[in-house]
């Protein structure tokens, strides 16, 4: 059961807690294809880079960070501006409690305001059953309304095993002939966050 859940914009002083969460997935799973956990300074720089344009959110339950979610550029070419790649990581003991769903709902609501049209998720998938990866992330994204697009076979090698990569997508805004320009996160932040950078829940986001 979740306690008092709050969604907030990430702060740099949160970075070490987020890095601890990420370290688990680097060292124990194939959910991320990184081999080495980044340094704290590198991790902070990643946060800074993402926040220049996209949302980076943390979930706190009774004041303790339990997970985080963010969007990043799908591709550097200008024509891809309305597409983003999404990433989410939860503390291992905080999965299957609804936190991931609420984080994703908040992220999606913000991306809509930014005029993003496509949310894309790059998800590792096991070639063979094993201890480092399952299909939970795929099922989670299906539950969130994502559809599978394509699979890259045996394209990731980690823990002496090969893993597939599945791309999934969700359309969240109309594709128009005269597309509205993409807005930066800081241009829409005040519409959904209070002065303490806490998400103001609306009726479309339920706990």
Predicted region positions:
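Conserved catalytic-core motifs of GNAT/GCN5-like acyltransferases
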Residues: 122-124, 138, 142-161, 173-174, ...
């Amino acid at each position: 059961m979740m306690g008092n859940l709050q969604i907030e914009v990430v702060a740099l002083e949160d970075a070490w807690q987020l890095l601890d969460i990420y370290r688990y997935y680097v060292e124990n799973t194939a959910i991320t294809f990184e081999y080495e956990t980044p340094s704290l300074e590198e991790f902070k720089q990643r946060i800074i880079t993402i926040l220049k344009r996209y949302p980076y959110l943390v979930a706190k339950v009774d004041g303790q960070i339990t997970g985080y979610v963010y969007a990043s550029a799908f591709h550097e070419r200008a024509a891809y501006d309305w597409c983003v790649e999404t990433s989410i990581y939860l503390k291992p003991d905080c999965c299957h409690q609804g936190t991931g769903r609420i984080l994703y709902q908040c992220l999606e609501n913000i991306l809509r305001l930014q005029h993003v049209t496509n949310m894309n998720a790059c998800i590792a998938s096991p070639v063979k059953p094993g201890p480092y990866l399952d299909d939970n992330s795929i099922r989670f994204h299906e539950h969130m309304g994502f559809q599978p697009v394509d699979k890259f076979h045996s394209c990731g090698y980690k823990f002496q095993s090969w893993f597939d990569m599945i791309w999934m997508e969700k359309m969240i805004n109309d594709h128009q002939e005269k597309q509205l320009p993409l807005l930066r996160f800081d241009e829409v932040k005040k519409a959904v966050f209070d002065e303490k950078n806490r998400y103001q829940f609306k009726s479309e986001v339920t706990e």
